[in-house]
Amino acid sequence: MASDRPRVLSGIQPTAGSFHLGNYLGAVRQWVALQESHDAFYMVVDLHAITVPQDPADLRANTRLAAAQLLAAGLDPERCTLFVQSHVPEHAQLAWIMNCLTGFGEASRMTQFKDKSAKQGADRASVGLFTYPVLQVADILLYQANEVPVGEDQRQHIELTRDLAERFNGRFGETFTVPKPYILKETAKIFDLQDPSIKMSKSASTPKGLINLLDEPKATAKKVKSAVTDTDTVIRYDAEHKPGISNLLTIYSTLTGTGIPELEEKYTGKGYGALKTDLAEVMVDFVTPFRERTQQYLDDPETLDSILAKGAEKARAVAAETLSQAYDRVGFLPAKH
């Protein structure tokens, strides 16, 4: 792998079972593309997952499932480093150092903790959830990542990463690369099929608006055909006045590579039913092979385990070197063997 490429790192939680269309179009698809231009490190972040209670058997199964889906989506272990976060203990070790450099007020200002703890109740939220962004800092700095692909909602965490890298470097000497946010350009924002005013998410009030990539293709087609639209009949993109139709056009355009103006022209004089029927077919053509590829990896656990073991080995080679340097700079007494 060309070491002169900028290094990029990102991760996905293993808590949801099936990826949904928003995950795929909003992040995973871009990860696949970044393999071509970057030295890419991708991980299933199971340490982050346990910041809220998890059933151990489900966590284990969902970690394997997330890895299988990433491979099915097009991540190539020959062109990127794919691993499970807990297979690289240096993440937790560096996180402790970063915790000790982070101000309490600084951590308190992280909006994601406020949002998540508000849902759980502050008394029930774990310290792990509170320091979640600091573990994310360690994830990034361990690999000396130049860029971190993020959506706008994660920008605050990248600012914390930059602050802590500069703080450590200023106090102990140049150690960490100060990363830049790689804001995912042209990321399709996919909305709920039943309520196009909210982002597609597992936490929606009804599963009818959510396209899970591992659902039966017939169920996926039915959800598309049942998508909420408006009382008009003209198919055109207008996110403010026609959010439902605009969402369907975005999905269609993103999956097929057809421009929205081209789609508007194609459906001139046709009703919403025609668009929904065609999009349902596009979705089925997409999810069917994705499901099959995911299942192939799940049916061959030895190959999946081997890919993850090799990925962890490659990741640890980088992480151990960074941690060793950080330990030395902080002043820890080296262990003699």
Curated annotation (Swiss-Prot):
GO terms for cellular component: cytosol. SUPFAM superfamilies: Nucleotidylyl transferase (SSF52374). A motif ('KMSKS' region) lies at residues 199-203. Gene3D superfamilies: HUPs (3.40.50.620), Tyrosyl-Transfer RNA Synthetase (1.10.240.10). L-tryptophan binds at residue 139. InterPro entries: aa-tRNA-synth_I_CS, aa-tRNA-synth_Ic, Rossmann-like_a/b/a_fold, Trp-tRNA-ligase, Trp-tRNA-ligase_bac-type, Trp-tRNA_synthetase. Its main location: cytoplasm. Transmembrane segments: none annotated. Keywords: Aminoacyl-tRNA synthetase, ATP-binding, Cytoplasm, Ligase, Nucleotide-binding, Protein biosynthesis. Its EC number is 6.1.1.2. It catalyses: tRNA(Trp) + L-tryptophan + ATP = L-tryptophyl-tRNA(Trp) + AMP + diphosphate + H(+). GO terms for biological process: tryptophanyl-tRNA aminoacylation. Signal peptide: none annotated. The keyword Nucleotide-binding applies. Homodimer. HAMAP family: Trp_tRNA_synth_B. Belongs to the class-I aminoacyl-tRNA synthetase family. This is Tryptophan--tRNA ligase 2. It comes from Streptomyces avermitilis (strain ATCC 31267 / DSM 46492 / JCM 5070 / NBRC 14893 / NCIMB 12804 / NRRL 8165 / MA-4680).
